[in-house]
Swiss-Prot record:
Protein's name in the database: Putative HTH-type transcriptional regulatory protein MJ1164
Domain HTH cro/C1-type: 131-189
DNA-binding region extent: 142-161
GO molecular function: DNA binding; DNA-binding transcription factor activity
InterPro entries recorded: Arc_TR_HTH, Cro/C1-type_HTH, Lambda_DNA-bd_dom_sf
Keywords for the protein's UniProt record, in alphabetical order: DNA-binding, Transcription, Transcription regulation
Domain of life of the organism encoding this protein: Archaea
Organism: Methanocaldococcus jannaschii (strain ATCC 43067 / DSM 2661 / JAL-1 / JCM 10045 / NBRC 100440)
Transmembrane listed as a keyword: no
Amino acid sequence: MMIMREILISECIELLRSHKFIVSKPLGRSCFDMVASKEDIRLILKILKNIDSLSRDQSKELKKISKILHGTPLIIGIRTRNAPMEHGVVYDRYNIKAVTFETFRDYLEGSPPMVYANRGGFFVKIDGKVLKEVREAMGISVGKLAEVAGVSRKAIYKYETQMANPSVDVALKIEEFLDVPLVKGIDLFEPVDDEDVENKLENLEDFKKEAINFLNELGFKSFVVEKAPFDAVAEKDMDNNLNILLTNIEEKDNEEVKRKALFVRELSRLLDGYSLLILEEKEKEYKNLPVVSIEELKKMDDALELIEHIKSMLRDIR
């Protein structure tokens, strides 16, 4: 099972790179597997064999991180709990779109999926405005169209006012009868808008709380994250530019901390941001990482000073 997921992850990386996306290295034990970026598109991807294995909490965290990083969450999967996923169909897991690798590939090549799965079957989004205009121009009554499509007059009214979407069969009958294309493609890169970003500081160790409070005092807006390779994301608007700071906060340094911080440094470059490792006890200077102690952080005056300090550390690295 794991091997199948690993293969799917490599295929996704290859596909995204072939479409000129910059892709992060795959992640372990995180609510997302990779970040892919191209121009103004930013995807936060989760790769799963069974899309129903994503829990409500995991999906909440995936949506939260996507919102903080100004990206779109997307799941690439193989099956649902009950059956293999259909090609060309968009599934939904707690308001995150999920598609097969083949559907994703078609989308990147310019053929968006038209069908989405919901309780009760497969549905399509149609252009209700065009439906109404064409029906009226052809002098066809709501009753007549309802009869042809095998639905109620109320259903036709709902399609025309975009209050409901028809099943695939009903849409085909309507399109055939009116001889006009009505079905709209589904945008996989549309941002998900339903997540209020909760900031839970109460479960954090004291030194982490302290570090985040100092970042906020410097003028950053900081968000705590779980199930990610970083502990917090700090943001600051400066010179009409959003500075994103991926932050790891640790008690002291060890190999695992360093490995994670190096990974986050690479990820921050992909996001045109910065990374920072904040240590409660900093025992030495670091050659290849922006690192500060909580004491050093306390001495800074504002966000600009910290960003400039990180830039100078990065110049030393290079």
